[in-house]
Swiss-Prot record:
Keywords: Cell membrane, Membrane, Transmembrane, Transmembrane helix, Transport. One of its GO terms (molecular function) is efflux transmembrane transporter activity. The chain crosses the membrane at residues 7-27, 43-63, 69-89, 98-118, 155-175, 220-240, 253-273, 297-317, 352-372, 374-394. It is a multi-pass membrane protein. This is Uncharacterized MFS-type transporter YfmI. Its main location: membrane. GO terms for biological process: response to antibiotic. SUPFAM superfamilies: MFS general substrate transporter. It is found in: Cell membrane. Pfam families: MFS_1 (PF07690).
Amino acid sequence: MSKGYYSILFSQTTTNLGFSLYTMVVISFLFKMTNSTTIASMVTLISIIFRIFGSAILPLITIRLKLPLTIIISQLIQMLLLICLFYALLRTYSNQTLILVFIIISCISFFNGWFSPLKSAIIGEIISPDRRVKANGLLSTVDQTFQFVGWSLGGLIIAFLGEGYTIILTIFLLFTSLLSLLFCLPHGHANSVIREKNSPNKSIVSGWRYLFSQKKLRTIIIMDLIESWAGMIWIGSVSLAFVNEVLHKGESWWGFINGAYYLGSMIGGFIIYKLSERFQNKLINFMLIGAVSYGSLTLIYGFISNSYLALILVLFMGPAYILRDLTQETLIQNITTEQTRINIMSARSSLVQFIFMFSILAIGAISDFLGVRLVYVSAGILLLVSAIYGFSQLQFKKKVNKHISF
């Protein structure tokens, strides 16, 4: 792997670790300040909305700036905004302070929405197609490991250091991420291709048009959208409700369930990294296997009440999810070109987060009126529908067309 790849790997790790701490700090601070669960929970919704906006306008930036420079600028601005947030946390409570905190959160989320599509586009440009499965597998393994550490130990870190010093730790993590990008990322390579000089409107629309113009890409995106509706099952409030109401366990088991899922994801990413050569030439097959496995396990999980069996199922869900997710990511990187990749990644990120936002809003009603068990059952059905659709479009039609050609 190139030096630029390890720069992205280190940057993603420190950024996501920092933002797991940042999210917990902000939610904890707002809850203590207002004693309102509703206001604290608004952090997630506002973050998603502004990440959508950030991803949507990213093509306007990348027609003028190289991808490495864009990702460096986004990290620098987020670091400066975190410094502003640190000073906001020191202020005494007032409505003005509350508004200021939410403005800073919105701005941070806007620029944070650039990171994922930029990362995927840069990996697609600096890594050759025959090594992308391995590259994405290692990225996922390291990322899941440090997110697990962040979310597991975040509460202890905040309790020990306090909100202010935890934000300082987050700023330090983003600073190290920025240094890695500055000194290791090959600024002259990525985004070196000649791009069409489109108008701002065309630059934004082109990504959305590309999403549905190529058959394989269109199928993967539609699968993505269906799966996004099912993504709400791992929202903290939903998984905690399932543990309490269905498994009849407390918060400790909620931690075990979350830990098992992250552990499974780490194992899945490591397996894909080690066996990348076997996956590389059969991406569609393994994507569909992962989709069917994840959907089936989720559906079964929705019907059970045994906590130990639930733990085992969640442990296996992790590798199934990672298998589906990494093969989808690699397929998109392989299908797209350097001229279109960032526009497609930006449009995809915006669309998936938009659907996910609505699934969050819908999940409360489903859970309250029909019960949290049905949430997981319906999610499992949606995931299987996505897998069946993918099989019908990518495998069945291919076999039919081959048969007709003879």
